[in-house]
Amino acid sequence: MLEIKYVRENIEEVKQALAKRAGKADFEGFARAEKKRRELLQQIEELRHQRNTVSDEIARMKRNKEDAGTSILEMRTVSDEIKTLDKTLAEQDDFIQQFMMAIPNMPHPDVPMGASDADNTLEKKVGTPRSFDFPIKAHWDIGEDLGILDFPRAAKITGARFSLYLGSGAKLERALINFMLDLHTNEHGYTETLPPFIVNRESLLGTGQLPKFEEDLFKIEGQEYYLIPTSEVPMTNIYRDEVLNEENLPIKFTAYTPCFRSEAGSYGKDTRGLIRQHQFNKVELVKYTTPETSYQELESLLANAETVLKRLGLPYQVVTLCSGDLGFSATRTYDIEVWMPGQDKYREISSCSNCEAFQARRANIKFRRAGQKKLEFVHTLNGSGLAVGRTVAAILENFQQPDGSVVIPEVLRPYMGGKETITNETR
């Protein structure tokens, strides 16, 4: 959430920033509510002053044993008027709060302007895509031919956009999870967490999925609980409504969790394979930082995610998202896109974002500098380190062999009992 004082004083700048995101908001309604709120506050203040004056007059009359009935009636009338105005004020405050919760973060000044992913800026390419001298297959065909992925039976068990891993497929997924967690905890200094996979409404409000994106979530019927769309949500809410000490920052968390997304609006997109699933595994990275170090920490977060791909030997590129492609809570985002030869394109495998104080303001996460009484909002950052299913897909496509087998990246072999190649396991 943006600071309301900033929005009040810079309304045109906020309008322009929202326009760069191709977003819409009821700024006229906000202005009316703000005007009405100021009028109500003035009226309430005047009535309270009147009530206090009458109260003092009643006390004086009682001391002098005078009849205070008329004054008492006047005070009750004034009190009733105050209650009515307080109710109207609460309605205006609620409208303003809902307006503020629906406004996305402001793009960083360095973010390129644009309307869609076609306007994103390429930062770098790492690794050279492999040349194949045999027909390339997509990962869904490779996995099914090897007997390690079974999409038809997953659909039978649940429905579309679910996957069933078998044998070495399941081991490869688990190996990647363990490798990523070991890398981020042992080398990158993150603290491993195992958070709940179900969160309450307040948690999703804090990170920005609610109220605007409820249709993208899986809600538990009859409860104010939701399945997590990413472990960014529980990890960012660990310190909700708390005050941290500057000396403990940055705080760096990582977690493996399944993630659940309804993929509303994705009909017809990536209907095959592991790219767009209702349930998928992800290793997530979250940081709490001071404002002055958050962009340095963003570069570090990006490097941490890149290291996974470098160790696996997968070619990738990094792009900066344009204003129209930014996520709701982010002010700047890097996407890492891995090369998928079976699809002849780069596909997103990680998003690394700085949300500055946007989430911290919504979740009320503050810190205190040494020797200072004033509290400040932390900056929060998050990034995938990495999306596990998409990494499996990239391994299958990049390391496929002419005989249909797949070479296991060397760094994963200790996690797979020394196995070097996945061969046909069809049952």
From Swiss-Prot:
Predominant location category: cytoplasm
Purpose of the protein: Catalyzes the attachment of serine to tRNA(Ser). Is also able to aminoacylate tRNA(Sec) with serine, to form the misacylated tRNA L-seryl-tRNA(Sec), which will be further converted into selenocysteinyl-tRNA(Sec).
One cellular-component annotation, GO: cytoplasm
One GO process term, biological-process aspect: selenocysteine biosynthetic process
Protein's name according to its UniProt entry: Serine--tRNA ligase
This enzyme's EC code(s): 6.1.1.11
Pathway(s) of this molecule: Aminoacyl-tRNA biosynthesis; selenocysteinyl-tRNA(Sec) biosynthesis; L-seryl-tRNA(Sec) from L-serine and tRNA(Sec): step 1/1
Subcellular location as annotated: Cytoplasm
Top EC class of this enzyme: ligase
Matches recorded under InterPro entries: aa-tRNA-synt_IIb, aa-tRNA-synth_II, aa-tRNA-synth_II/BPL/LPL, Ser-tRNA-ligase_type_1, Ser-tRNA-synth_1_N, SerRS_1_N_sf, SerRS_core, tRNA-bd_arm
Residues binding L-serine: 230-232, 284, 384
Keywords, comma-separated and alphabetical: Aminoacyl-tRNA synthetase, ATP-binding, Cytoplasm, Ligase, Nucleotide-binding, Protein biosynthesis
Catalytic activity of the protein: tRNA(Ser) + L-serine + ATP = L-seryl-tRNA(Ser) + AMP + diphosphate + H(+); tRNA(Sec) + L-serine + ATP = L-seryl-tRNA(Sec) + AMP + diphosphate + H(+)
Domain notes: Consists of two distinct domains, a catalytic core and a N-terminal extension that is involved in tRNA binding.
Gene: serS
Residues annotated for ATP binding in this entry: 261-263, 348-351
